[in-house]
Amino acid sequence: METKWFDLRTAEDAERIAQAADILRRGGLLAIPTETVYGLGANGLDENAVLHIFEAKGRPQDNPLILHIPDASWLTRYCEDVPEAAYKLAERFWPGPLTMILKKKPCVPLRTTGGLETVGMRCPDHAVTRAIIEKAGVPVAAPSANTSGRPSCTTAEHVREDMWGKIDGIVDGGPCQVGVESTIIDLTVTPPQLLRPGGLPLESLIDALGEVTVDKAVTQKMNDGEKPRAPGMKYRHYAPKAPVTVVTGGAKASARYLLTHAGENAGIICFDEFVPLFEGHIVHPLGASDDKRAQAQHVFDALRTFDETDVGEIWAQCPDSKGLGLAIGNRLKKAAGFHTEASDDGKTVVGITGCTGAGKTSLLHALEREGACILDCDKIYHEMLESDESLRKALRAAFGGTIFRADGTVDVHALGLIVFQDAEKLASLDAIVCAHVPRECARRMAESNAKLIGLDAIKLIECGLGAICDVTIAVTAPEEVRVRRIMARDGITEEYARARIAAQQAAEYFRAQCGCEFVNDLPTAAEAAAAAEDFIHMIIKNLKEETER
């Protein structure tokens, strides 16, 4: 079959719109853009055209289709007993990502509705598609324009991958702005019931209607033999080729969980701020943990991207269920066949960093007195040099065998001579360390019985470890104070102490990167200890209050 391509990204073209509409009138299949995902459209009143949708997608025929219309005035053409609530929702949210389940009229074939006496109605928020429907003069039945079992399409190129040569035309209307399918609400029951979370948050429906219940299929698999009342309820859509595990819980806790559970050949879907932690993996960022609109736009692209790789498994962070998070989580969990793992461990992680000589020890001791498990990343790195074969292999590949002694141990001095005279090699060492140490830190956090963890790392920010801390503290002190401390601590000259300070990031860097600052310029150890204890008490109190809010 020849597939026609209609480029309507930049302007409405009356001639091309008419040509696209003619495909629908003649009973053909046309991929259309919407604000949510691309749809595979056909005349919803033509049983043969609808059958071709199921054939092109490989879609089960008991999976209902949604009718797309240009405005609410078309509702009474295809629906019986339209309730006032439907017009109320249409006025407030149409055009937009909302589908309403209503009683169908006899003119709507049972093939379109999956054998149900109800039909889903939607007005898409895409001017080109509404113009095509208006010109065609028929309601357009349109599930997502992907092969069944594949992630939904959010660009016309995605549609081309799945449907070229199988359908009559593809309308390129640009990338979808929402990225997840429409929200579906059943208005034939009292109170109204959410059947599928989508681009319109549940909270918006509750605000408009009052009470809205949530069907159990939103959060768990339907039982065998149950008939789906709306698209996306029963069947495992959005499934990439590799098995998916979705990790629920707080963003930081779930990132720590991924670090300790994802295998070497795992693909990672994570929030933007955690990407540096997964060096060496194929990573698809979902969006920042606090930006659910971006997450919705990226979720299907993330799932689809991994099909072009050889990853053996996919691990995905899951947003909370507020706002669009309910829909994003629903799509991820469906991709995983509802295979989820919970990450919340009740642990609080305090990251401490700062310049040499700033006095981090005072804060670390204060944390210890609160029962914290202290993880010294530098110490962990040196322990890994002795025992971690993956790290040793990476070092050998980067720096050769000359950094190893005859007994096979790493000669740290020899390694230092190489990297401290060559900025590129130092950067290479930093990258290797950052690819290995965070995973070991996360493993030790998970193994510890302590609920409070102190993470001591000079490279806390660069390695991405700061992102998995509940709070990050920059410890600073005036340069003259640091010089005196380093000289006394290490027995070195003032010149050497100043050279060490000059080789590190300035205090301003740590101050800008961390959530708070502890200025340790006190003259005695006792005064520093008392101030550190007060500071840690304040930090723990603030974290507790944030958790309770």
Language-model features: where?
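ATP-binding Walker
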Residues: 358
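ATP-dependent small-molecule kinase phosphotransfer cores
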Residues: 379-452
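NTP-dependent small-molecule kinase module
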Residues: 18, 443-452, 466-475, 479-492, ...
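Walker A/P-loop
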Residues: 361
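Active-site-adjacent structural elements in enzyme catalytic cores
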Residues: 1-344
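Hydrophobic anchor at the beta1->P-loop junction of P-loop NTPases
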Residues: 352
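P-loop (Walker A) phosphate-binding loop of NTP-binding proteins
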Residues: 355, 367
